[in-house]
Structures are given as structure tokens and as C-alpha cells.
Amino acid sequence: MTLFVRRGRGSHPKPTRLLTGNSDSQRIMEFRNRMRDRGSPALFATQFLLLATLLLSGCSTLASRSNTGVVVSRSAQIRSSTAVVAADLLEVNRGDVIDILDSIDIPDPSDNSKRELWYRVRAHNDDRTEGWIEARNIMPDKVLENARKLAEEDKGTPAQATGQLHAGSNLRLTPDRSNNENIMMRLDSGSSFEIIGWKRVPKLKGSDSTESDTAPKAGSATAGANKGPQSDEDNPEEQETTELWYKVRLSPQNSPAPEGWIFGKQVELMVPSDIIYYRTGREFVAWRRIDDDSNDETSTKGKDVAKESRPGSWVILERSSSKEPHQLDEPDFDRIYVLGYEKHDQEHYTAYRSPDIEGYLPLRIEGRGSDKTFSIRIKDDSGKITDAKYSLYRDDRGVMRVAAPGEVKGKRRR
């Protein structure tokens, strides 16, 4: 009989024979030990590979949770923590791309009943600076992608007008301010943009006449605060059941998001100085130059966009002013006004003024030189909305004229 003693757990020394017995049993035991010793490296390698796979899988999961974002503020600080006394680590500017690693909600220091969202981020600088930044300064890539899809849908729609914010306002993905989930970023007062369309939606119950998250400057009085109580008849705003939203196209200098929606009460239409004095009791809601350099006039140029237009010929869409509440399905405009320009005399003249119509956007101008047309959409007597194309031409005296749909052009000047 042969007895074996194992020296230590986890080690595999050769067995020590204390008593000698059957030699066959000894050889069998030694063979089993050799096979066990040879199998250990293979087992260890298998376990190592399994562990490495799990670790890599974990890293991949963490990487998939992170995404990128774009800085929307003019400038912002990446900080060492979310604390008020945290150190500033790095300044980032509008358009900078950063990695979003994590997020956290913390109590608002100025109001504990509210919470602020912060992102843990990594900058794309040489040091790959990591820290914390307020979420309002960042537009996640998913939001930006949705804004780009919106712009792609409207890429063929020309600018209908230009506008400018007279107060800071939110740029939203949809025309809805019942919640904050669709807010893409905050636009500064004075931001300018192209207006490519608008829409009326039901008015929020109990909503103010301004954007819900627009606060007045400290120490300033609220508009109408010193006025006495007004009845619904004295204040038409109280009778409104709808609110107006503008779909706008923005330049990269103002927003990484190329398109979005802005609450109408924050927008001032920037009617070009060349035509502003030709309003005759109706609002100008859309305008396009007829001249060949019209593309220069429809681009967003900044705060003074309305002051930079040169004299020329225009197609203008007008809407009658009314004290009646607006309706959801009301037309965009009710009259077409074509303003010609005589270069020799440097004077404007009325080339065409349509009868009252129920017209809808968009306004499009096609052609070059004197051979041009413009098109809109009109509701006919049956209630159907159809395309309508108007032709521009010059008569024997060189005066611009307009042939409405179905009319024959007059003789052109050669």
C-alpha cells in the first residue's frame, strides 16, 4: 500500500511515497498527476481569455452609453464638480464637440424645489479634459440629428421672410411649449434667422403672452403692470384661442441646429427698408425679391438685415389686420402685392395687386432675367388648395406687369 501527502493547496508537487506497495498503483497515480500538471496552463489560459472577454465586453457597454454633444452657448466652463465653488478647468465655445460620459440631477442652488441637469464630459483638446458642465450648454448629438432631419425635409423651401428675436427664447424641435422635452437650446435676444413657414396651434390654458421660461430683467416692470384691469373686449389677446409659431432656419453662427421652431410672440419680422413704407393697412407676412440678386437678400445677415436691402422689385404677401381671434385653419395671407422698380427714375410703382384670396405658403420664384414666374397655393371655390403660378413680363413701355393664372401675357419689350 502506498500513501501520498499533498504539501499545499494550489501547488502540485510530486507525491512523496511514505510506504511502498503495489508498483502498478504507483504508476497510475503518477500518470494522473502528470496529466493534471500539464492541464493547468491550458485551464489558466482559458480562464484568462474568459476574463479578458468579460472585461472588454464591459468596456464596450460603457462606451456605447456615452455619446457626443455640441456646445450651444457662446462660451461655457467645464468645471471640476457640480458645486458652486468648483474650479473652472476649461472654456469651451459654441460649436465645440465634446463626449458626454454621464449625467446627474442636482438641486438648483437658487431654488431647492427645482433641479438642474449636469453632464460629465470629456473635451477634445490635447489634454482630453474631463469635468462637469450644465446640460443647458450642450446639445446632445441625438437632438442635433433630429434638427438636421427637419432641415433636410425643408431644404427645397426658400426663405419666406426674415425675423429677429426681441427677447431670449427657446429653439424647439416641435411647436409645443407644454413641456421642456423638445427644447434644443436657448437663443439670445437679437438672434436673426430666415422664416420658412409658420403654424398656429391651440393656446395653452393659463399661458402668459410670452414664452413660459422667459424671465424679465431684474428690476424691470412687466408690460401692462401699471394698467388697470381690462375686459376681454379691450384686450384682444385674452380672446385668442391659438398661438403662432415660426419655423426658422438658422446660420451656424447662431445655432448648431440648422432648423427649429420659435414661439411667435418673441419674433419681430424684419421687413426690408426698401418696402416697409408701402404697407397700406395690411401686414407684410412674406416677401421675395424679383431681381436676379434675390439670393443675397434672403440670407440671414444679422441684426441689421432689414436695413441692408437695395431698391428693387418685390413680390409681397399681405394679410388683413383683424381684432377677431385667429383660427387654426386660417390662410397664411389674403392678398398679393407686386412692387416694381424703375431704375431710371429710382421710383417704385404698383405692378400688381390681387383681389382678396385665401393663400398659403410657400412663395417660390423661378426663372431668370425678365422671364420669371412666382407660385403660391390658393384655396378655390370648392375648398381645394391648388398651386397657382403667376407670370411676370414687361409691356411696351417697359413697365413690369403680372399675368394671373389663366390670363394671357401682354406684349413684352424686346
Descriptions of predicted regions:
Residues 1-41:
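N-terminal secretory signal peptides that target proteins for export/translocation
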Residues 56-58:
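C-terminal motif of bacterial Sec signal peptides marking the signal peptidase cleavage site
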Residues 61-66, 112-163, 210, 214-305, ...:
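Boundary regions of SH3-family modules and the immediately adjacent low-complexity/disordered segments
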Residues 66-88:
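Post-signal peptide N-terminal segment of mature Sec-exported envelope proteins
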Residues 82-87, 173-181:
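Short alpha-helix capping/helix-loop boundary micro-motifs
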Residues 88-110, 179-240:
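Conserved beta-strand/loop element in small beta-rich adapter and peptidoglycan-binding domains
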Residues 312-329, 371-380:
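Short beta-strand elements that form the blades of beta-propeller/WD-repeat-like
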Residues 336, 346-414:
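Hydrophilic extracytoplasmic domains
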